[in-house]
């Protein structure tokens, strides 16, 4: 490296552990937080450093972790099998980093709250001190379960794990976060100096601090005032608590950007969701996936929206489920509407109570106000779909399309037996079962003629049984 140049950074993320306290058949690091795998949050923070390489050390259910994270070209994997501790895990990355120099930043796949600012602070402090190793520590009120930072004359001397700590060491409030920066040059040789003489019979990465001190390699610390960012996830309750923090952070970001969230504690908005200014979100709303909500819209209580695009000035009333749907400006949906994937709802269109859409286009100004199923349908502009209308799209083997052209009027309790087309401006009489195309401007009616039988009720009363 030329003088003054920052050495390259390499990130290693440990993600090999089983996570037995999760009591799960799935890899711990793949459990979702705000719609993304736990480890994906760590990866995003790692990428804020623009590292030369990112290596994920996998072990328990390694194939599943690889599959879940496939398609990320900057990510390489190293296998730890069997799992024999954190130092052993880091050693497995040596092959992937052979011939590399610079700074290695070590992260844990189950610590998703770490901020990019703290990570940058770690790297900057490490470079400024020309340290062999730099450890992120935190001051906590209840240090139980964490490795303690033992200092001599103010400098870090060693890290002692809870199981191996003396009563005096257990009283120490400064804990190890499991987040480190290392100079790569002495690292691999130092790792080979670690022994497994501890209560667990494992190779502890924390032993590196003592080894570095004995070898005269400077060890520095970056001390955090709280452990909020560095909390790990080892149980379902910890997963729930971290998820709550991530959701709270997301809600606060949206509110700071001009979104009204009436009750943030009961509002679930995933990490990938975007919401425009002056939109109002009521209690119990769930926004998932890559959903986008425009400006000045209103999403009422207990509605769930997944991977959908909601335009400006859209109203979604209570208890709707909207999946994979695009809704244009000024439209209204609900209450109790179910929009399955593949719909496009036009400007100022209306979908009312107990209406279900599937792979349907509803044109601008059209309305289906109540009690209808519209599937595999293309509906033009300014169409009225009466209550109880059903597009009968399935013949038992295949799905068929229904086309309703601009300005048509579909009377209540109508069945449209697909494939069928209702032409521009045509009317369909209420109660009809339409099996043939209705031409533009025509009236289509297909029902039995009404017959009134005079005096029938009185005669029925006189019939003796």
Briefly describe each language-model feature range.
Residues 31, 112, 173, 180, ...:
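Residues that recognize and position ribonucleotide moieties
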Residues 260-445, 450-451:
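Structural signal for interior beta-strand "rungs" in well-ordered beta-sheet cores
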Residues 63, 73, 114-199, 206-208, ...:
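Conserved core of the sugar-phosphate nucleotidyltransferase
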Residues 173-276:
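Conserved alpha/beta core of the MobA/IspD/sugar-nucleotide pyrophosphorylase nucleotidyltransferase superfamily
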Residues 14-15, 57, 106-108, 136-139, ...:
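Short beta-strand segments
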